[in-house]
Amino acid sequence: MIKIIGLDPGMSKTGWAIIRLEEKNNIKFLGGGTISTDGKLGVGERLHIIFEQLKKVIFLYSPNEAAVEKIFINKNPKSSLTLGYARAIAILILRMTDLPMNEYDANYIKKSITGNGHADKGQIIFMVKQIVKSSNIKCHHTADALATAICHAYTKNFCFMGIGS
């Protein structure tokens, strides 16, 4: 069975979600959460927290593939730069654990999940809950990571080729 980790990197909050592709094109939500870092800490300390927590998640769930939301350029260059740091840490841990990785634009993820490339957070949360048949997804960072993982499964056609079974 294929397990996919989806990541929504951020310096303050990094969302993660793990799905498993099952028989009959079902997608099972195995776990998800948000890695939070305190803004009072230095950049190095915050990045270390993200790195260590992601490493624990990867070793706990042993995913086969990874999907990461691509960076978007914010109006505030400092925000874009710190987002880039968090993405770099996420990509580094995926590389260190030999996980094949794909990156997806936020609008592409939204369109693949909701049919609308400009869907809002509420629409994404609603749709991922429907797809994985779970009401346990409350945080939008986890929902975004879950949407990224589902988007990867759809894009790679795992669900439609019977590979998950």
Curated annotation (Swiss-Prot):
<comment type="similarity">
    <text>Belongs to the RuvC family.</text>
</comment>
<feature type="binding site">
    <location>
        <position position="69"/>
    </location>
    <ligand>
        <name>Mg(2+) 2</name>
    </ligand>
</feature>
<dbReference type="GO" id="GO:0048476">
    <property type="term" value="C:Holliday junction resolvase complex"/>
</dbReference>
<keyword id="KW-0255">Endonuclease</keyword>
<keyword id="KW-0238">DNA-binding</keyword>
<dbReference type="GO" id="GO:0006281">
    <property type="term" value="P:DNA repair"/>
</dbReference>
<dbReference type="Pfam" id="PF02075">
    <property type="entry name" value="RuvC"/>
</dbReference>
<dbReference type="GO" id="GO:0000287">
    <property type="term" value="F:magnesium ion binding"/>
</dbReference>
<keyword id="KW-0227">DNA damage</keyword>
<keyword id="KW-0460">Magnesium</keyword>
<comment type="function">
    <text>The RuvA-RuvB-RuvC complex processes Holliday junction (HJ) DNA during genetic recombination and DNA repair. Endonuclease that resolves HJ intermediates. Cleaves cruciform DNA by making single-stranded nicks across the HJ at symmetrical positions within the homologous arms, yielding a 5'-phosphate and a 3'-hydroxyl group; requires a central core of homology in the junction. The consensus cleavage sequence is 5'-(A/T)TT(C/G)-3'. Cleavage occurs on the 3'-side of the TT dinucleotide at the point of strand exchange.</text>
</comment>
<dbReference type="GO" id="GO:0008821">
    <property type="term" value="F:crossover junction DNA endonuclease activity"/>
</dbReference>
<protein>
    <recommendedName>
        <fullName>Crossover junction endodeoxyribonuclease RuvC</fullName>
        <ecNumber>3.1.21.10</ecNumber>
    </recommendedName>
</protein>
<dbReference type="GO" id="GO:0005737">
    <property type="term" value="C:cytoplasm"/>
</dbReference>
<keyword id="KW-0963">Cytoplasm</keyword>
<dbReference type="InterPro" id="IPR012337">
    <property type="entry name" value="RNaseH-like_sf"/>
</dbReference>
<keyword id="KW-0378">Hydrolase</keyword>
<comment type="subunit">
    <text>Homodimer which binds Holliday junction (HJ) DNA. The HJ becomes 2-fold symmetrical on binding to RuvC with unstacked arms; it has a different conformation from HJ DNA in complex with RuvA. In the full resolvosome a probable DNA-RuvA(4)-RuvB(12)-RuvC(2) complex forms which resolves the HJ.</text>
</comment>
<keyword id="KW-0233">DNA recombination</keyword>
<feature type="binding site">
    <location>
        <position position="8"/>
    </location>
    <ligand>
        <name>Mg(2+) 1</name>
    </ligand>
</feature>
<dbReference type="InterPro" id="IPR036397">
    <property type="entry name" value="RNaseH_sf"/>
</dbReference>
<feature type="active site">
    <location>
        <position position="69"/>
    </location>
</feature>
<feature type="active site">
    <location>
        <position position="141"/>
    </location>
</feature>
<keyword id="KW-0234">DNA repair</keyword>
<feature type="active site">
    <location>
        <position position="8"/>
    </location>
</feature>
<keyword id="KW-0479">Metal-binding</keyword>
<keyword id="KW-0540">Nuclease</keyword>
<dbReference type="GO" id="GO:0006310">
    <property type="term" value="P:DNA recombination"/>
</dbReference>
<dbReference type="InterPro" id="IPR002176">
    <property type="entry name" value="X-over_junc_endoDNase_RuvC"/>
</dbReference>
<feature type="binding site">
    <location>
        <position position="141"/>
    </location>
    <ligand>
        <name>Mg(2+) 1</name>
    </ligand>
</feature>
<dbReference type="GO" id="GO:0003677">
    <property type="term" value="F:DNA binding"/>
</dbReference>
